[in-house]
Amino acid sequence: MASFSERTAILVDGGFYRIQAKTLFGDKTPEERADELFSYCIRHLNKGSAEEASLYRIFYYDCPPSTKVVFNPIAKRQVNLAQSDQHRWMTAFFEALMKKRKVALRRGEELSSGGEYALRPGVLKDLCAGRRTVESLTD
């Protein structure tokens, strides 16, 4: 076994990883995504090394899913984010990560700003230029 000074910690930006993993590897269940993350970290740890590296811990940093109630201006109704599919998926994903050996979940805090709907820059530009109408917007 490697000595303490030879062990490696891996830090994962959870928000970035989730978006990139979904783009690169497609939709997965929370358990499959947790397995994928662990395997990905182990492959990265040993890539390009003649010696097998020793993992100290994987630190996964992410904010807990939002529980806010926000107004959807297109549907003209309140949306409880705590009851969303994304909230359920994130909660199950965090639970799956916590069951993994050598994985530590570090949760940040949700920003007090946010929690409102925002238009993508290209959509806003099209609205201002008259190439799109408010009625054409969808969720």
Question: Can you name each region flagged by the protein language model?
Answer:
Residues 1-139:
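Domain-level signal for Mg2+-assisted phosphodiester chemistry and nucleotide/NA-binding surfaces
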